[in-house]
């Protein structure tokens, strides 16, 4: 499937995306009501956004502690190009690793890890260390994510808020 060009998204598409990022369970009728379209027109736009891979999925946000995953850590891995594919394969097969970022800088990969206990975190970290040096940080508190900012020329010119 081919992704829509940014220019192909009009203001109504952008409004729909903003609404669905905040609440992916909104019905087509409710989306239509909020953006001034009929239910069929809103649903057709949502289907087009899905078909063109602008909307790539929907998911429930689950509290890890409710599943007994009380240890949350960020693990950074510095590896070699030769080991990169193996490290990524390990991450994809390890259920405690919930997200992986390939980054620039000294580290190559950053993993979000959720474990039931410190002993399991130690096992995951030791296994990752086979691919290179690791640095582990325990997460004290995670704050809610935000919807993606609108990628428009005006958004790229917005000033970064200054601290109080």
Predicted regions and their residues:
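A compositional/biophysical signature of low hydrophobicity enriched in polar/charged and small residues
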Residues: 1-164
